C-alpha cells in the first residue's frame, strides 16, 4: 500500500529523529487524518478536542508540549486560535 505523501515523508523523517515520542507521531497522524488531503501543505482547521481524542492524548499539557515541539522541529506550522469557538489552523510541512 502506498501511503499519502505528507504521512509517508513524516514517517521517514520520524524514524531517524530521536526527539519524537509516540505522542508526537500519534498527534501528527491525527492532524493528517483531519487534513483536507487535496493540497498537502495548505492550512486547515483543527480542534484540540478532536485531535486529543483521535491521538489518545489525555493531558492538555502533553498536547501543547507536542504541538510546540512539532513546530520547533519543523514538522508543522501552527496558528493558534485564542477564541474557544474557533478552531486553530495548522499546515503539515512538506519540506525535505
Predicted regions and their residues:
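Winged helix-turn-helix DNA-binding recognition segment
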Residues: 35-94
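Generic structural signal for short, solvent-exposed loop/turn connectors between secondary structure elements
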Residues: 1, 95-96
Amino acid at each position: 500500500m502506498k501511503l499519502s505523501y505528507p504521512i509517508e515523508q513524516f514517517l521517514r523523517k520520524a524514524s531517524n529523529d530521536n526527539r519524537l515520542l509516540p505522542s508526537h507521531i500519534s498527534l501528527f497522524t491525527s492532524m493528517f487524518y483531519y487534513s483536507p488531503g487535496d493540497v498537502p501543505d495548505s492550512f486547515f482547521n483543527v480542534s484540540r478536542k478532536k485531535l486529543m481524542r483521535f491521538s489518545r492524548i489525555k493531558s492538555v499539557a502533553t498536547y501543547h508540549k507536542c504541538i510546540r515541539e512539532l513546530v520547533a522541529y519543523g514538522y508543522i506550522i501552527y496558528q493558534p486560535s485564542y477564541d474557544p469557538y474557533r478552531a486553530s489552523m495548522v499546515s503539515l510541512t512538506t519540506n525535505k
